[in-house]
Regions:
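Catalytic domains of carbohydrate-active enzymes, especially glycoside hydrolases
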Residues: 17-41, 277-284
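N-terminal ordered "arm"
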Residues: 10-13, 24
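Structural preference for beta-strand elements that scaffold enzyme active sites
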Residues: 32, 208-212, 284-286
Length: 290
């Protein structure tokens, strides 16, 4: 999606550009658009986070893909003018400036959240989204908040909450806590991303185009899932591929392997939930590398 940058983008292709890609597919008589993973890969806020196969969540989308024009308009005219100028600057670059794009979009998210956040979080649409996605959304939001607070995605190094405790996390997420404004910002962004990708999906279906997603077979060892569900993984192992014509030394992807015996005991619930979530947005998907 990042490569779909258009004149309406903010320095990088976004979910709004997907609709323009669908229009092109219709004009050129194409039936399927396959995209790379669009999950959040934010580890350090550096350009090294741009690798789409090392996500911090199997559910959350990367905030970078939010079409800020769909999100809303800033009432502060001076701030709005500043972002319009920045959009033109970032769009004029010959290559995507990953760090600048993300930093600028986050500045926008914070301002718009202060302006619109309470109203959106009180809406029926958001409440329905939250209840349907709370199981993954709440841990993801807290993980992201603590990652930035402790300046590392390696939860083992966090001075507090290094071992996931659902009750403690639930307490942090109560609206009266000092943590809540920081945590709920992630709810707000994920809600907008959900609406935007769902809109693109419905648009594709209306035009007879299949959106095909991509599921990385592995998870990051510094991810929400490794933090909240370590029993599903062999965190002392590393997945990869043996030598072949493309890599004479083989490949070490660094991802932990799955504990299939544990997964089998609950009927592969972890995978079922993952596939069901993907099916909300995609009519087909690839499991890479299977």
């Amino acid at each position: 999606v990042f490569s779909l940058k258009s004149e309406k983008s903010f320095g990088v292709g976004d979910f709004g550009d997907l609709r323009r890609m669908i229009d092109w597919a219709v004009i050129t008589h194409q039936k399927v658009i396959q995209i790379l993973p669009v999950n959040d890969t934010t580890m350090t806020h550096a350009w090294t986070d741009s690798y789409p196969y090392n996500s911090i969540s199997i559910y959350a989308f990367h905030p970078m893909y939010a079409d800020i024009k769909q999100m809303g308009t800033l009432k502060d005219k001076e701030a709005a003018s500043k972002f319009n100028k920045k959009q033109k600057e970032l769009n004029s670059l010959p290559a995507i400036d990953y760090e600048a794009v993300n930093q600028t979009k986050w500045e926008f998210f914070n301002l718009l959240f202060r302006q619109e956040g309470k109203k959106v979080l009180a809406s029926k649409g958001f409440k329905d989204f939250f209840e349907a996605n709370k199981e993954w959304l709440q841990p993801y939001a807290v993980f992201s908040y603590l990652r930035d607070a402790y300046k590392t995605p390696n939860f083992r190094k966090w001075p507090r909450h290094s071992v996931y405790n659902a009750e403690d996390i639930e307490k942090m997420c109560q609206p009266e806590t000092v943590d809540y404004p920081h945590i709920s910002l992630y709810y707000y962004i994920q809600y907008h991303l959900h609406l935007q990708l769902l809109s693109a999906t419905e648009y594709a279906r209306q035009h007879g185009v299949v959106l095909k997603g991509d599921i990385p077979i592995g998870i990051s060892r510094n991810s929400v899932e490794a933090w909240t569900e370590p029993h599903y993984f062999n965190l002392n192992g590393q997945a990869g591929a043996p030598p072949d014509d493309f890599s004479i030394n083989g490949q070490n992807w660094g991802f932990p392997t799955y504990n299939w015996d544990v997964m089998e005991k609950d009927g592969y619930r972890w995978w079922m939930k993952r596939f069901q979530k993907m099916a909300e947005y995609f009519d087909a998907y690839r499991i890479d590398h299977i």
